[in-house]
Structures are given as structure tokens and as C-alpha cells.
Amino acid sequence: MLWQCLEQAVTERLIPYNPANGCRLPKKEKKKMQIIPPEKIRDYLKAAEEWGVLPMFYLELSTGLRRGELVALLWSDLNLQTKTLTVSKSVSRGKGELVVTEPKTENSIREIYLSDEAIRLLVEDRKNHPFSPYMFPSPKTGGMYGPDCVGRIHKKLLEKAGIEEHVRFHDLRHTFSTLAIQSGIDPKTVAEILGHASAEFSLDVYAAI
């Protein structure tokens, strides 16, 4: 847009030449992806178990769900017969209240196959709150966790597990991607699990490991 305006100014003889000619934007440096070091994942999950949130964070590390998707899960989203989890909504905080919305893209609406261990943990945890519609109800309110609250718990788990790396909650998606690709799952499948339109993100992960 700026280049075109300057070209027009040259045409109208307002300036002698276009100063933007030959200018190149600096290459955008890709941020190095942070993940939980594989050798520390056991410590992280142990911390989650001691904190009483193992099912939630085990599911996160085995699916790479977005934070809002994780806290929006209902028990009706889990199909025990097909061992699948339907991801069709997300939670965000707006004007101090939790708001449930549909995903922004069609690719974000998806079914994910769960491992037997993930299902076992979820079913066992269900016994603690059998009448709640939420998969992970807040022990304080009985309602949904706020996404920010889950982020704070994640930080506590890192501290308890002695993980010094600066790993954001969102980086758990990178952790899942890394582990999935290293285990032989193709980037396209990983992208589908994550709810991405293409495998580009997964390929970036592959290039970084």
C-alpha cells in the first residue's frame, strides 16, 4: 500500500523517486518452540496427580487441545463406545464472565481418538462428580474452569515438577505435536488432531526437533 502511494506520487511528479524501491522487509524470525522436555513429562504428570488434576493434563498432553477447548468439554462430548472425543466449542472470558462459543474455523470442529489410558483416567475421575455435565468442573464453583485458572495451575505444576523452562500452557500443544511426530504419526494427522487447516504447523514442529 505504501509503495503504491509513493509510485503515484512519482507519477504526479510530487517526488523525484520512490524511496521504497529496493527496500526489503527483514525476515521474521521464528520463535523457538518451547516444550516440556520429554524426560520431565513424568514429573509433570506426577505433579498433576498430586494436585488432583491428572485427567485434565494427561488429556491435554495426549491431544494438544486449546485451553478454551479443554475447559469447555462436557461428558456428552465423550463417546466411550468409539473412544472418541468431540471438540465443538471453546470458552473465553468476556466482561468478567465465561462465554462459550463455537470455534472460528470448520477445522476446529473435530473428533479425536483417545488412548485407553486417557479414557480410564476420565472415567475414574467421573466418580468424583457424577452429576456434573462438565468433564472438568471447578472444585470451587462446580462450573467450568476459567481458561486463566487452568493456566495458573499449569504454572504451579511446572514449579512442583522442577521444570525451569519457560513453558506456556499453549506450549503443551507443541509438546503434544513433538511427541506425536517423534512417535511416527504423520504431520497431516497431527494437524487434524490439533484442528489446523494444514500440516504447516506440524511441519514447523518437525523441523524444530
Predicted regions mapped to residue ranges:
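C-terminal catalytic core of tyrosine-transesterase DNA break-rejoin enzymes
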Residues: 11, 54, 58, 62-69, ...
